[in-house]
């Protein structure tokens, strides 16, 4: 079955509606990296591990790391491929396995970017993730039609500089939505 994508959501945020009960996505903001006829791929940007830090990650990879890299937050990117490391970052964007998402944001998952981050010469800003979120063809469109998500344009301030605990509400506020006023029941006209 062919799924026609009206407009790619790459570079946009998905904001979980308050009624979304999936524990992986409740109160989440997900940055969409890829959205096409083959499905969608994104990274949850407002959840982090309590017990996994940059030090833990770089130690497991046998990479010596500077103090700033050891203190790097490791984010829970989603429930898929939880053993894989992904990096959302600004410039420079020319790493071995990079996908430029916007003029200012790329996603990479190669060893060279991780070595650069560990050495203190990686891209700034950057966020490290374990795991990702993925949708089969048509799945994200169905979830949007069910009102599981709001969408809003991506912006670097929310992505890289807003505290994690504020991202869900700030993303909604960026499109004029007060999440506290939304009903848990969806309707269609």
From Swiss-Prot:
This is UPF0301 protein Dalk_3037. Belongs to the UPF0301 (AlgH) family. PANTHER family: UNCHARACTERIZED PROTEIN YQGE (PTHR30327), UPF0301 PROTEIN YQGE (PTHR30327:SF1). It comes from Desulfatibacillum aliphaticivorans. Pfam families: DUF179. One of its GO terms (cellular component) is cytosol.
């Amino acid at each position: 079955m062919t799924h026609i994508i009206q407009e790619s959501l790459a570079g946009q945020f998905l904001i979980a509606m308050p009624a979304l009960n999936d524990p992986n996505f409740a109160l989440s903001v997900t940055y969409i990296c890829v959205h096409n006829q083959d499905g969608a791929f994104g990274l949850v940007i407002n959840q982090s591990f309590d017990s996994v830090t940059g030090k833990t990650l770089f130690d497991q990879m046998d990479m010596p790391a500077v103090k700033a890299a050891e203190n790097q937050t490791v984010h829970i990117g989603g429930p898929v491929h939880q053993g894989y490391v992904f990096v959302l970052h600004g410039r420079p964007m020319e790493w071995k396995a990079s996908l430029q998402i916007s003029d200012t944001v790329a996603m990479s998952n190669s060893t060279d970017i991780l070595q650069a981050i560990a050495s203190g010469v990686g891209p700034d800003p950057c966020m490290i993730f374990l795991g990702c979120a993925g949708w089969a063809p048509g799945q994200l469109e169905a979830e949007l039609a069910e009102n599981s998500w709001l969408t809003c344009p991506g912006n670097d301030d929310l992505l890289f500089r807003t505290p994690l605990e504020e991202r869900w509400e700030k993303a909604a506020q960026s499109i004029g939505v007060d999440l506290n006023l939304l009903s848990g029941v969806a309707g269609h006209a």
